Amino acid sequence: MQSARNEQRGTGPESPHAASPTEGFEVLLITGMSGAGRSHAAHSIEDMGWYVVDNMPPKLLEPMVDMMTASKSGFHKLAAVIDVRSRDYFMDLSSVLSHLDDLGLKTRILFLDADDNVLVKRFESVRRPHPLQQGNRLIDGIHEERRLLENLEERADIVINTSKLSIHQLSTKLYEALTGNGPTTVSVHIFSFGFKYGIPIDADFVADVRFLPNPYWVPQLRELNGHDAPVSEYVLSNDKATQFLDAYEKAIEIAIQGYAQEDKHYVTIAIGCTGGQHRSVAMSEALASRLRSHGLSVSVSARELDRKTQ
């Protein structure tokens, strides 16, 4: 990381204040007791947009950061999982993390723990030996691992005891700890479509608004679409459209609250009419506006607008 260090220290003669390529890059070390949920944590953290590497020796952290910043991969968060099978590398950890801190990297340690009796039950349920058991009792392996990791737990930035947590609850705690945003937020994507071109297979909800009067049969509206004010006004002025939006808004709001509790980060809503040009487009935009009023992040697209109106 010589070039990164030079830029950060301002040794470049032409741009003494040039930003380091590692500026804003984050490193998270995932460690803790075997059976405490490291694998589940890694999957959840990957879903949050981190690049996750399993069983990485600490000495490879710096070259990995170099490679990711040089390749402009789009990832600016690296999470590395380290367990007791790489315990020979722990002696390198302190110096490596100190060096990364000197480079201006935001580096944190996540330590996952669980009570001994819970760990015993988890290992027995999967009928696997503890990695440090070595022919001894299961509890002996757990005690040895706890001894090895004692100092690492003390210097951890985030410690989570998973004894009483479900997988979803662990994911929620990780999201809160790593983002500082409180409970899981759910992003909503709404898209309009035409039933004549097929029902989408990737939607969580599919709504049929073909019960509304069709602007296609109004000559002055036929060549327009649901983004145009005359069409939107025609569709939304119908009492049934308002009743539908009132009911659907409430249903979606309840579902999103449940999705957040289950750690689902996004929901896709498809709204269809015959050709996907008029009613579904106008209703998608109207629903999006309502959901945004609740503070939700909502995006909208129209699947069929590139098709010629028929």
UniProtKB/Swiss-Prot annotation:
ATP binds at residues 32-39. Residues 1-21 are annotated as: Disordered. Keywords: ATP-binding, GTP-binding, Nucleotide-binding. It comes from the Bacteria. Disulfide bonds: none annotated. Pfam families: PapZ_C (PF22740), RapZ-like_N (PF03668). The keyword Nucleotide-binding applies. Displays ATPase and GTPase activities. This is Nucleotide-binding protein BLA_1368. GO terms for molecular function: ATP binding; GTP binding.
